[in-house]
Amino acid sequence: MSKSTAEIRQAFLDFFHSKGHQVVASSSLVPNNDPTLLFTNAGMNQFKDVFLGLDKRNYSRATTSQRCVRAGGKHNDLENVGYTARHHTFFEMLGNFSFGDYFKHDAIQFAWELLTGENWFALPKERLWVTVYETDDEAYEIWEKEVGIPRERIIRIGDNKGAPYASDNFWQMGDTGPCGPCTEIFYDHGDHIWGGPPGSPEEDGDRYIEIWNIVFMQFNRQADGAMEPLPKPSVDTGMGLERIAAVLQHVNSNYDIDLFRTLIEAVAKVTGATDLGNKSLRVIADHIRSCAFLVADGVLPSNENRGYVLRRIIRRAVRHGNMLGAKETFFYKLVGPLIEVMGSAGEELKRQQAQVEQVLKTEEEQFARTLERGLALLDEELAKLQGDTLDGETAFRLYDTYGFPVDLTADVCRERNIKVDEAGFEAAMEEQRRRAREASGFGADYNAMIRVDSASEFKGYDHLELNGKVTALFVDGKAVEAINAGQEAVVVLDQTPFYAESGGQVGDKGELKGAGFTFSVDDTQKYGQAIGHLGKLSAGALKVGDAVQADVDEARRARIRLNHSATHLMHAALRQVLGTHVAQKGSLVSDKVLRFDFSHNEAMKPSEIREVEDLVNAQIRRNLPIETNIMDLDAAKAKGAMALFGEKYDERVRVLSMGDFSTELCGGTHASRTGDIGLFRIISESGTAAGIRRIEAVTGEGAMATVHAQSDRLNDIAHLLKGDSQNLGDKVRAVLERTRQLEKELQQLKDQAAAQESANLSSKAVDLNGVKLLVSELAGIEPKMLRTMVDDLKNQLGSTVIVLATVVEGKVSLIAGVSKDVTDRVKAGELIGMVAQQVGGKGGGRPDMAQAGGTDAAALPAALASVQGWVSAKLQ
């Protein structure tokens, strides 16, 4: 009996654990140590700094099953996913790693034992082929003499990519740094499948499939190309879980393994599809894996960077669901089946299931509103296309108006053998960006052009007043030697107490003073390593080299400090109340308010807002010490310090702790103790985007001001109701009850008036061939009363055709009623349409009742006068 995918994963980890390897959990799909990577795409990513010698672990052997995504950037498999046997946006990479421990001999022997051992994978040895780098005689001899593979199944691969060491069998991290030869293991599916061994002209066939790549990091490549042996060679291996599962389960396509069969059946169930061989099922089964795990790792759909890649994958899946005939939102329903089939690897996803489902559902609902119209436009454009290429302008219009990522458009076109002019699409995108820049209305931002060679030393943690020297001056972005009174400028000092805007905290304000001059600072910004003071010289003259006294606005800084410290407390409180999925997505810390954007799928309940508020105020009352420590980044993370997603940190970081409640990396300015904050109040909670909520709050004096304002409003209301704040609830309830009674009485009077009006109108009906026709314009009648009157009149008149109209604030309201015995000759919908057209409107409804509106009240008398002739003709 073949192993399940989950059992294969566990067997791999168990095998290497038995060989002294530390089992290390999969890292996030969002790399936390490599800004050059969009997503984690290999098992070695989380160990990159270990291989580079920048990080040390307490183990020298490791094994992982690493979640990986390849979609976007250099590794973009998206367009092939679902159409080939082995392309995926998401896959798991099984790996074993040696950090200066074992090398080629053990790495090869471990691989062979796992693959062929009777207690492990038990693959037939004669089905396995290997490749080695052309000059790697050591690996060749291990395979031939120690493992015993015949020479004809060991293939040397040279530099087949056009340059020295550019080979399928030579791995390098970059132009310089660790590199080395690799050996790859292939499985022969048999001669019933087309394809040749690696290195042959038929190597792209599906017969011989690479299942394991073992990299031997033994050199350090120098800038001049020289290869220096590493003092401690290492090993990095990777085996695709889905590929080895296909081999062990005796299938040729990854989509036929148990994991994908289960997901494909789930997709068919939620979309209503019956043909399990449909490639759209494969696309969706793949895409739910990448989308669900990306959301679980903190990525949300957006129009930029990782969020845009996620959006593209979701929308591609939704479009394929549409092709399968899905009539309602379906994609989020696959998260549950995915969790089940992933086994132990899905535990983190299970913890965040509700959040992930909500994000996927919201994104699908948004796209569903425009998908049908966008596809109709694309069909229309393709139908009239003369050549075989869709122009970039149309592809851009689909993106801009209907939210179609260009690869989704390309997907549709591909099915019809049509290409997309992607260069034209990019040109249209750039033109839109240019127009947006020109239309921003802010003119040129000269300060953004400032380049400062010197550095400024920030001393504002300990000082609010400091003497410094002017090292540079800028006016309209250009360096100058001096400025005069009235000029706006940017002043750079050698040292300053002014905090430059960063980490969400606004820049300081204050004054720079000296011999005969005063410079008012309205903002402080960073320019590389320099700190610029933006403002206006109000008196005197200032030149480079002048000595200045820098004075920060102390009261303003104090308010900012309170708000910043409260932001940290609120972040920790949100994670306690809502869950650990809460992550900071943006913030503003000013002297007046703090604003905090965070990941959460639904509006906070009033009880949750109160709980967060109470929790923060409880920490304020504890008067916790607020302490800062400078330490290594890894030590800070080990201490549990929260790092902001996407933020780049130096090797040495500033860790801010508030007792046992909050620990974060932060370079901002803060209170000394939580008690300094005084009071914390949330003033609003709202949504800014799918899955992103925003809280605005105030502290200290600002919070007290909101308390006073609320108290004043309550007193004003109490005064109006002739009560006091103590019995205000009873007073309001009494007023509401009295209002309901009066509204009920008023409606009764209106009904009576309408009934009386109906009785008066019935006598005005005229007889047309045995059918009573009543046409009337009514004054002082609410439009919603017309329907009641028509029902009353139909009961009174028997066989009848009725048209009533009223004009309120210049707008015409019309209604037509026809008794059921007359609807075979006169249709209310047709009648009301004829009248509405004459008063500048339109309408419709059932044969016995129809309503309409119009804008031309002056034309109403003539329109009503035309009814009798129209009805008479119908009754002939």
Swiss-Prot record:
Its EC number is 6.1.1.7. One of its GO terms (molecular function) is ATP binding. GO terms for biological process: alanyl-tRNA aminoacylation; negative regulation of DNA-templated transcription. It is found in: Cytoplasm. SUPFAM superfamilies: Class II aaRS and biotin synthetases (SSF55681), Putative anticodon-binding domain of alanyl-tRNA synthetase (AlaRS) (SSF101353), ThrRS/AlaRS common domain (SSF55186), Translation proteins (SSF50447). It comes from the Bacteria. Binds 1 zinc ion per subunit. Belongs to the class-II aminoacyl-tRNA synthetase family. PANTHER family: ALANINE--TRNA LIGASE, CYTOPLASMIC, ALANYL-TRNA SYNTHETASE. This is Alanine--tRNA ligase. It comes from Salmonella paratyphi B (strain ATCC BAA-1250 / SPB7). The gene is alaS.
